[in-house]
Curated annotation (Swiss-Prot):
The keyword Ribosomal protein applies. This is Small ribosomal subunit protein uS2. Required for the assembly and/or stability of the 40S ribosomal subunit. Required for the processing of the 20S rRNA-precursor to mature 18S rRNA in a late step of the maturation of 40S ribosomal subunits. GO terms for molecular function: structural constituent of ribosome. Belongs to the universal ribosomal protein uS2 family. It is found in: Cytoplasm.
Length: 301
C-alpha cells in the first residue's frame, strides 16, 4: 500500500507503540472475513494480527478521508466510552464531526427529525456497538471505515482496519495514528519531524481515577502552600538569652520572710474536748444498764 515509497513504510517507532498498546492482540474467536488479517494463533487460542496489514489499511483509510472535500462531512462515531475521548480529539485536529455517545436512530435516514445529517464518510470505533449507524449508512450509500477485531463482522464495512478495539490504549493509538496520517496527507504537518501532539491525549481516562488524581493534586498544592518557606525561620533564636528571661522580681518576693509574711494567717480550728478517762477498765464510763433500757422500751409497746 505504500507504493514502494520508503517514506510511507511502517517505522520502528510506530511498531513499538503498537506493541506497547497491544494493538496486535486479537480475540479467541475469528470471523471468516478477518482471517486474512491474522498472522498466527497462540497456544492459548488468542489470534495475533499482522501489523503490516494494519498499517496498509490505515493509510488507505487516511487517503479516503483526505479525498473528502469538506472535513465536516466526515463523521467519526464511538458509542463505547473508551473511544469517545479519542473521537473528540480526532475531530478537533482534523475538522471532522464527532458523535460521542449514543447514536440517535434515524439520524441518517429520517429527514423529519432535527438530528438529520447527510455525511459523506463514516468512521466507527467498533462494528458491534456502532451497528446502528453502519446499517443506516448502508441504506443511504455512505462508505464506512471501521476499526475491526478478529471477531468483528464486516457487513456493510468498506474499509476494515484490523486492530485490537477492546483496549483503551489501542483505540487511542489507532485514532492518533489516523489523525497524524490525515494531517500528513493534507500537508498540514511535515513527515520528518515527529508530531508534537502526544498520544496520551487520545487515551481514555476513568472519571473516578481522574477525580482522585485531581483531588490529590489539590491536597499536595495546599500542603505546599501551608508549609513555611524556611523550616528554621519560624524558630529563629533571639539575640540575647537575657531578653527572653523574665525578671524574678515580677514572679516572687525578694526574701523568704516576705514570702512567709505574704501568706495569709488563719486561726487554728477549735479542738474537741477529750473524753473522761476511767480508772477502772472493767466498767466503761457512761455505761448504763442495757437490760433496763430494753425492758423499758418493750413495756411501752
Amino acid at each position: 500500500m505504500s507504493g514502494g515509497l520508503d517514506i510511507l513504510s511502517l517505522k520502528e517507532d510506530d511498531v513499538t507503540k503498537m506493541l506497547g498498546a497491544q494493538t496486535h492482540i486479537g480475540s479467541e474467536n475469528s470471523d471468516y472475513q478477518m482471517e486474512q488479517y491474522v498472522y498466527k494463533r497462540r497456544n492459548d487460542g488468542v489470534h495475533i494480527l499482522n501489523l503490516r496489514r494494519t498499517w496498509e489499511k490505515l493509510l488507505l483509510a487516511a487517503r479516503a478521508i483526505v479525498a473528502i472535500e469538506h472535513p465536516a462531512d466526515v463523521f467519526v462515531i464511538s458509542s463505547r466510552p473508551i473511544g469517545q475521548r479519542a473521537v473528540l480529539k480526532f475531530a478537533s485536529y482534523t475538522g471532522a464531526t464527532p458523535i460521542a455517545g449514543r447514536f440517535t436512530p434515524g439520524a441518517f435516514t429520517n429527514q423529519i427529525q432535527a438530528a438529520f445529517r447527510e455525511p459523506r464518510l463514516l468512521v466507527v470505533t467498533d462494528p458491534h456497538t456502532d451497528h446502528q449507524p453502519i446499517t443506516e449508512a448502508a441504506y443511504v450509500n455512505i462508505p464506512v471505515i471501521a476499526f475491526c477485531n478478529t471477531e468483528s463482522p464486516l457487513r456493510f464495512v468498506d474499509i476494515a482496519i484490523p486492530c485490537n478495539n477492546k483496549s483503551p490504549h489501542s483505540i487511542g493509538l489507532m485514532w492518533w495514528l489516523l489523525a497524524r496520517e490525515v494531517l500528513r496527507f493534507r500537508g498540514t504537518i511535515p513527515r520528518e519531524p515527529k508530531w508534537d501532539v502526544v498520544v496520551d491525549l487520545f487515551f481514555y481516562r476513568d472519571p473516578e481515577e481522574a477525580e482522585k488524581e485531581e483531588q490529590a493534586g489539590k491536597e499536595s498544592a495546599a500542603a505546599i502552600a501551608d508549609k513555611p518557606a524556611d523550616e528554621f525561620a519560624a524558630h529563629a533564636p533571639t539575640e540575647s538569652w537575657n531578653d527572653t528571661v523574665v525578671p524574678s522580681a515580677d514572679l516572687a518576693p525578694q526574701s523568704w520572710a516576705e514570702e512567709s509574711a505574704s501568706i495569709p494567717q488563719y486561726a487554728p480550728a477549735p479542738q474537741a474536748a477529750a473524753a473522761p478517762v476511767a480508772d477502772d477498765w472493767t466498767t466503761p464510763v457512761g455505761a448504763d444498764d442495757w437490760g433496763q433500757d430494753w425492758s423499758n422500751s418493750t413495756s411501752q409497746w
